[in-house]
Amino acid sequence: MAKDIEYNETARRKLLEGVNKLANAVKVTLGPKGRNVVIDKKFGAPTITKDGVTVAKEIELEDPLENMGAQMVKEVSTKTNDVAGDGTTTATILAQSIINEGLKNVTAGANPMSLKKGIDKAVTAAVESIQKRAVKIENKKDIANVASISANNDNTIGNLIADAMDKVGKDGVITVEEAKSIETTLDVVEGMQFDRGYISPYMVTDAESMVATLNDPFILIYDKKISSMKDLIHILEKVAQAGKPLVIISEEVEGEALATIVVNTLRKTISCVAVKAPGFGDRRKSMLEDIAILTGGQVISEDLGMKLENTTLQMLGRANKVTVDKENTTIIEGKGQTKEIQGRIGQIKKQIEDTTSEYDREKLQERLAKLAGGVAVIHVGAATEVEMKEKKARVEDALSATRAAVEEGIVPGGGLTLLKAQEAVGSLKLDGDEATGAKIIFRALEEPIRMITSNAGLEGSVIVEHAKAKKGNEGFNALTMVWEDMIQAGVVDPAKVVRSALQNAASIGSMILTTEVTITDKPDKDAPNPMAGMGGGGMGGMGGMM
């Protein structure tokens, strides 16, 4: 395949056109008064969104050189979204400003490599300034504020996420699903839940709701099948003497062992529920170990030389309550040692850091949540499918932003933190083209606040100058159109989002500034049309088959 090669100014100018086309489409969504973008879909209804990364992902340009520029800026927003979950529009605006200002200087004769050094030094100074302004999240109200801002000032979503985080803790799992109704609701499963139900419906304690609820039970955790009654009879007798119910978690309970449990449960001799162990293979062993640590019991494993018939009550786990339905088992308030549970949580966190597989990370995260607090599900409801998709995307954004805020704290929002970082950049002692590189970042840092106010129908430059003169956290609230303390007004951004947006924008911006040659595939004008030659009659010569 022949290639098109462009050099110097021509190459950079085409890349810049692509950058501007994408950035101009994305930046209209910024701020509380940002506008929607409607995206046509080949199948189904069009998507209406105010999410920068969703807009960016849809953009493909016809000109291959322009498209290269657009794809590089798309990388800024997707990387920021992956790392921090929000701030994609801000990152795109910063990248556009860095690239536009930078290319003006390169055209005027500045050395691109020196500009890059200056940009890197300025970004380091700005990031330090952002981190200094960060305030740790103290309460539920702060979480609600962060989530509301990220969900485009939707307080309902903000409060739901704050409730969910409050209930399951920062290590808990919060998932987002589509609701069957138009209401958006929150369901919280406290304790450890896994997707295995009772082996026999005869084990239920409430025939109406078909649920088995056992209060203060013993929990037997065994990693093999139980089929022989003689293995089990000894422990059943001890549990019956103690006057407590029993939960059996094992690979399988079958044959005479199952029959004996069912008969004794129906006769009310003992209240016992058997469930299959969750997971498969090595993951099953890990999950059984988690349950054992949570309940203060032991996994009865023949690999460790333990036999089921020799099990004592001290080897069994305990919990305040266990509920089992047809599909799920929930262990509430396991009576394990806090120190051991914390040790296990630390171990899983380390595995999450070390793993390279996304699937493994997800499964480890689930295990962590089950040990640490629980699982919350936000059911997103809306009147139409189009609204549902848009709302669900906002909830997912808000959730990611909230996690980022818990991690690195919050900073004043509305573009104020980036604007105030100009002070740190301005105080750098640099010379020549490095100083010019720092000035490029200095100029870019005021672009987000300029765009937020511009989308609100005001003159951005005027607001920028006023904001520079203000002290502390006082900034312009584009939603209420007043000057106020941004933190007190609840206009906050996660520090991680602001930091990631700037670092990713500067990274891609520097790449484009230091580009000297572009190589693209040359369109093949003489390529044969695969449908030509078939003629208007389709598959000729088939008439005889009628």
From Swiss-Prot:
What is this protein's expression induced by? By heat shock.
SUPFAM superfamilies cross-referenced by the UniProt entry = GroEL apical domain-like (SSF52029), GroEL equatorial domain-like (SSF48592), GroEL-intermediate domain like (SSF54849)
Q: Which InterPro entries match?
A: Chaperonin_Cpn60_CS, Cpn60/GroEL, Cpn60/GroEL/TCP-1, GroEL-like_apical_dom_sf, GROEL-like_equatorial_sf, TCP-1-like_intermed_sf
Q: Which Pfam families does the UniProt entry name for this protein? A: Cpn60_TCP1 (PF00118)
Extract the PANTHER family matched here. 60 KDA HEAT SHOCK PROTEIN, MITOCHONDRIAL (PTHR45633)
Q: Which residues does UniProt call coiled coil?
A: none
Its subunit composition reads: Forms a cylinder of 14 subunits composed of two heptameric rings stacked back-to-back. Interacts with the co-chaperonin GroES.
Q: Which residues bind ATP?
A: 29-32, 50, 86-90, 414, 477-479, 493
Q: What is this protein called?
A: Chaperonin GroEL
Q: Which keywords label this protein? A: ATP-binding, Chaperone, Cytoplasm, Isomerase, Nucleotide-binding, Stress response
The upper taxonomy is: Bacteria, Pseudomonadati, Spirochaetota, Spirochaetia, Leptospirales
What is this protein for, i.e. what is its function? Together with its co-chaperonin GroES, plays an essential role in assisting protein folding. The GroEL-GroES system forms a nano-cage that allows encapsulation of the non-native substrate proteins and provides a physical environment optimized to promote and accelerate protein folding.
Catalytic activity reported? ATP + H2O + a folded polypeptide = ADP + phosphate + an unfolded polypeptide
As for subcellular location, the record says: Cytoplasm
Can you tell which superkingdom this protein's organism belongs to?
Bacteria
Q: Which GO terms describe its molecular function?
A: ATP binding; ATP-dependent protein folding chaperone; isomerase activity; unfolded protein binding
What's one GO BP annotation on this UniProt entry?
A: protein refolding
In which family does this protein belong, per the annotation? Answer: Belongs to the chaperonin (HSP60) family.
| Enzyme Commission designation | 5.6.1.7
Cellular compartments per GO CC? cytoplasm
